[in-house]
Amino acid sequence: MYYNPKYAAAGLSGWAKPEIHDNVGDFFRTGFTQNSTFNISQRKNDVSYSFSISDTYQNGIIPSTGMTRTGARGAVDWKVDDRWKAGFSANYSSVKVKAAPGANSGIINVVYSAPAEYDLKGTPYHAPGKPTSQILFRNTSFNNPYWWAANDEFSQHTNRVFGNAYAEFTPKLNWGDRYHLVFREQAGLDTYTSNNATVAELGSAYN
């Protein structure tokens, strides 16, 4: 048996048997991805169209991380007559990513540097009754990764719309089958908004 003051500060007895803990294996989890898509397309006479909706849900291997993505697409082509064609396509996507911080604010370095004799997962990550007082095997200038997963957030949310429309004119010039003259006018749009957020609760090492 040996005495660890960090265990005592976390509300445990403080005494522990020498054991080896798999802190890396305990922290990471199995990732999960789910994709769903619905599509409808048809061609009737001189008009063809296609519409689709897609959704992706993903859990990352780091707790509280993941991604959600929703998309929609539509396209229409219309042969007005032997000379004129017109059409458009439009796309929309919404992507939200919850990621783990890196560099000096990272939590993965804490996971990999945790001593094998310290039970990172089994030790409460804050003092009893004091959720803003982190418990960690080292100085709390770094976040306990479990405390971070329960309290902080690093996210990016991007909405994007892009597409184009066209009109095409093919005059009849009696040049035979080898030569054709085509006039095409096309305009497009691509716009997006992106919101990045870092949530650092009271007690976070970021504060």
Where are these regions (language model features)?
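Residues embedded in well-ordered regular secondary structure
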Residues: 1-63, 101-104, 148-155, 166-170
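A surface-exposed, glycine/aromatic-enriched loop/edge motif typical of exported proteins
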Residues: 1-2, 93-135
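Small-side-chain secondary-structure face that scaffolds active or pore-lining regions
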Residues: 61-69, 77, 91-103, 159-160, ...
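Transmembrane beta-strands of outer-membrane beta-barrel proteins
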Residues: 49-51, 86-88, 181-185
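Transmembrane beta-strand segments of outer-membrane beta-barrel domains in Gram-negative
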Residues: 130-159, 186
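Hydrophobic, lipid-facing positions within transmembrane beta-strands of outer-membrane proteins
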Residues: 34-38, 70-74, 161-165
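Short loop/turn motifs that connect adjacent beta-strands in outer-membrane beta-barrel proteins
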Residues: 43-46, 83-85, 172-181
